[in-house]
Amino acid sequence: MMSKEKRRVPKLRFPGFTEDWEQRKFSDLYEKISEKNDLSYSLDKIISVANMYYKSDAKVSNEEYLKTYNIFRYGEIAFEGNKSKDFTYGRFVENTIGDGIISHVFEVFRPITKYDIYFWKYYINYEPIMGKVLSRCTKKTTMMTNLVAKDFLKEIVFVPSLAEQKRIGILLNTLDKSITLHHRKLDNLKLKKKALLQKLFPKNGERYPEFRFPGFTDAWEQRKLGDFTNQINTFVNP
């Protein structure tokens, strides 16, 4: 994302932005918090950190267990230690949906400076930068990585002005919305195709499909597959 030049700037910028990105410690940007749920939040406010939505099917053993949950407020970030091909050391996820609660296994950090929520949604989750940061402030276990919060807060990151954050955040969020819209269109087309297949082909034991194009009225003929195919034998020399 950043150029290889000595100047701390990205290769692509919006017009009007020329100053260097500022070197900051994460401790200048975030503070670690541990705000426990006092039952102000119930089951319907449990957030899936991995997918960032309220879990409609969430279950807990009893109401008292909800007191172990951490409050996760809008704009805060949580560390998810699951390793994957995309995130070698786990990742940070920003809360962009609203206040709620998450399991106590997730460490939560609150922003302490003015920021653009959408810029940080993508920047704090950007593996080429954050992967290097997390490689130095996490400890590996068999399935997950554990964050060492004090080491994370000492790490350095380059940060643009708030105005540039907003421009970048708007662009990336707009692209995300467009991708989501196209995914929905694709899903709808797949459903339509599935429905058409059921109507364009006859059901088992029948010779007429439910839907036909104008001018086609004859029954479909019963034929053996051998009438349409030739067997090809492939020999491999030992």
Task: Map each language-model feature to its residues.
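A short glycine-rich beta-alpha junction/loop motif
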Residues: 6-10, 100-105, 139-163
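Basic chromatin DNA-binding modules
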Residues: 1, 26, 139-142, 156, ...
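A short beta-sheet element
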Residues: 49, 57, 61, 68-130, ...
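Non-catalytic DNA-recognition/assembly elements of restriction-modification systems
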Residues: 13-36, 212-236
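Amphipathic alpha-helical segments with low aromatic content
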Residues: 1-22, 155, 161-221
